[in-house]
Amino acid sequence: MNAKNLHTLGIDIGSTTVKIAILNDENEVLFSDYERHFANIQETLSDLLGRALYKLGPIQVSPVITGSGGLTLAKHLGVPFVQEVIAVSTALQDYAPQTDVAIELGGEDAKIIYFEGGNVEQRMNGVCAGGTGSFIDQMASLLQTDASGLNEYAKNYKALYSIAARCGVFAKTDIQPLINDGAAKEDLAASIFQAVVNQTISGLACGKPIRGHVAFLGGPLHFLSELREAFIRTLKLDDEHIIAPNHSHLFAAIGSALNSKRDTPMELRDMQNRLENK
């Protein structure tokens, strides 16, 4: 078929969300969306494909899957899989080739990717979800709000407290007495974000400098402006060195679409049927 009629579909299956991006032959994003999957990955992906079908009609796509929960599904559907670090690197190469370091926070993982002279080094957190999106959700519930509520509080902070972000249990031990003592929610919210920054920098960079052009990727850094500001403040970045793309929460999905070899075309509807019949 005509390559111009074949779109690429990137699917990112994360620990808490599913993201999709459909690109045209000029690698422009025609459709993108994301949804929390609550462990119902196939159902969630089917819903997202349904939305794409509603908007774009019965198009042909060449899909590629990435993400921590993507390999099993890729095998299941007979669709190519690409490692997330490769997907993200490809998207950055396309959007912001000047990137020196990328900081990516997900629902249950955190990564720092260094780009040095053609080499790519990825550092990732271990089994604990401290300092990630789910940690932020957990801390927000202590303040009887959600992540976006935490973000609103943090906009008006006046003081920062020391909170351990390496573990939700330790953080709770730090926060509860402050709540009991009447600490302002604004200050606690900003302190939680600062704890995430400290955990990411000390736990992942481990002394290796984060400098040059820094890209902020992943849902928490996309949706939570004050978390992003806490990183910028701590790393002392000026505007010229901050890379915060409009689609930063979809970068792995976009990057996986960019990795498509365009050799596995299928109808969106067929893909949806495969998900619903397995």
Language model features by range: what are they?
Residues 5-43, 47, 121-122, 126:
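Short glycine-rich, Thr/Ser-proximal phosphate-binding strand/loop in the N-terminal lobe
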Residues 81-85, 231-254:
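Conserved phosphate-binding/catalytic loops in two-lobed NTP-binding clefts
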Residues 171-206, 249:
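Adenine-nucleotide phosphate-binding core of ATP-dependent small-molecule kinases
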Residues 41, 117-159, 258-262:
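Glycine-rich phosphate-binding loop plus the immediately following alpha-helix
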Residues 69, 206-234, 245-249:
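Glycine-rich phosphate-binding loops at beta-strand->alpha-helix junctions
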Residues 136-137, 243-277:
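Glycine-rich phosphate-binding/hydrolytic loop that grips phosphoryl groups
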Residues 48-61, 200-212:
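Phosphate/pyrophosphate-binding loops at sites that engage ATP/ADP/AMP, CoA/4′-phosphopantetheine
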Residues 25-27, 34-37, 52-86, 114-122:
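Short beta-strand-loop/turn "lid" adjacent to the catalytic site in phosphate-handling enzymes
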